[in-house]
């Protein structure tokens, strides 16, 4: 009989089919409905041949995917740092307010802050070029923000018209239906938090369920350029001794990251060979002697920009990035990846890139330094970015922000799985 080859593509770290909203009336906090079985899970269970797709392209700033990569993908996604990698693009705002747990299950303070930010961005000729998406934990909070925005559209019909004509209009979605969507800027309303008496429940609706961490992973990986988290809840108010939910533990870690911009990264993802480190340090030292600020091994995944030269006129950005023929070369399977694709991706993220060969450095250091100086002098400057709505955290990938690292253990499936199924025709 003939055999047909089938490819099943999916990500077991994100949402499988769900029956969460199969009922017309759902109590999100107390629902015990489960995710449905997926064909992908069946393929994994019987150990079919698999191929992992590791390159990540959506996020134009590495901080936007850094938490998911570390927490859920075991740092196996290959991500690329951007030229302004010194500042995190995940920020957090804590509005003054509370979560109305007993009655409406709404958080009006967060909803108001989200809608105000939408109107502010749509009213700015430059900011309105970035598309906007709103993500909420619950459908109740989603509906509240939707209603508030409709009221604002009525007061600003010209802004509603601009949004209507946009190729990517504003969307407002919850955890259950945002998968597959993306926008330049994501505004994330947590919703849950202290009630009017200041008491915090450890019930976060669908996040508490088995697999709730998948919902969090979906929610925090929708942004291309920036993510602003709105939360009356602070990470220290989440008591993990009162819950065993992986989703709640993930939320606590993400709120800490949004506040501090720091991640705990496993040692294997940042280790470089001694010879590579020596060459990198020698070149970096020589550049420092020219009077420039320098940072080495930039990036939170396996891929690194070996040396970044900080712009003396804007210390939040790199003026030039240098790639050496070391670890990055070993991690690239083809010459096209090394010499075409990687520099192309970095150029698209705003980098000015110069490649330096180790043998050239040992052969004629002065000539290589001259080439570096010429590249610095000719590097185009980047436009100053608009001041964000909240002070961004300094982005680092070298420190733990909690005493116990167990809360940051990786999940149990591999990322981006492609399985082959052989089907015999009867």
PLM region descriptions:
Residues 290, 295-297, 342, 348, ...:
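Catalytic cores of nucleotide-enabled group-transfer and carboxylate-activating enzymes in metabolic
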Residues 347-412:
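Basic, glycine-rich
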Residues 213-227, 339-354:
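Metal-dependent nuclease catalytic cores in nucleic-acid-processing enzymes
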């Amino acid at each position: 009989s003939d055999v047909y080859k089938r490819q099943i593509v999916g990500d077991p770290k994100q949402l499988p089919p769900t029956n969460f909203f199969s009922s017309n009336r759902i109590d999100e906090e107390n629902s015990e409905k489960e995710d449905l079985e997926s064909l992908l899970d069946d393929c994994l269970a019987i150990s079919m041949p698999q191929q992992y797709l590791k390159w990540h392209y959506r996020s134009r700033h590495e901080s936007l995917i850094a938490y998911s990569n570390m927490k859920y993908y075991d740092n196996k996604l290959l991500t690329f740092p951007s030229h302004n990698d010194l500042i995190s693009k995940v920020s957090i705002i804590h509005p003054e307010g509370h979560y109305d747990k007993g009655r409406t299950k709404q958080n009006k303070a967060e909803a108001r802050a989200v809608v105000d930010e939408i109107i502010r961005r749509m009213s700015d000729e430059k900011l309105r070029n970035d598309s906007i998406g709103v993500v909420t934990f619950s459908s109740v909070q989603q509906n509240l923000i939707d209603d508030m925005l409709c009221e604002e559209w009525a007061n600003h019909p010209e802004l509603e018209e601009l949004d209507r004509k946009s190729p990517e209009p504003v969307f407002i979605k919850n955890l259950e239906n945002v998968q597959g969507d993306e926008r330049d800027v994501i505004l994330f309303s947590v919703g849950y938090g202290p009630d009017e008496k200041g008491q915090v429940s450890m019930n976060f609706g669908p996040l508490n369920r088995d697999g709730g961490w998948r919902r969090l992973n979906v929610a925090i990986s929708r942004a291309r350029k920036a993510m602003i988290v709105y939360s009356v809840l602070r990470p220290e108010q989440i008591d993990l001794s009162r819950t065993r939910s992986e989703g709640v533990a993930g939320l606590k870690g993400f709120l800490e990251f949004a506040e501090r911009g720091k991640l705990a990264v496993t040692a294997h993802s940042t280790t470089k060979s001694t010879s590579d480190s020596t060459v990198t340090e020698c070149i970096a030292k020589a550049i420092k002697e020219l009077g420039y600020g320098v940072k080495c091994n930039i990036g939170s995944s396996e891929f690194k920009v070996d040396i970044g030269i900080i712009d003396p006129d804007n210390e939040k950005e790199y003026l030039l990035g240098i790639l050496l023929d070391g670890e990055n070369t070993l991690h690239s399977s083809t010459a096209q990846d090394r010499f075409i694709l990687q520099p192309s991706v970095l150029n698209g993220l705003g980098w000015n890139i110069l490649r330096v060969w180790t043998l050239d450095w040992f052969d004629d250091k002065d000539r290589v330094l001259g080439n570096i100086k010429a590249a610095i002098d000719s590097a185009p400057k980047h436009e100053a970015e608009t001041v964000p709505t909240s002070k961004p955290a300094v982005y680092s990938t070298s420190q733990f922000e909690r005493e116990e690292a167990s809360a940051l253990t990786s999940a149990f499936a591999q990322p981006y799985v492609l399985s082959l199924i052989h089907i015999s025709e009867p």
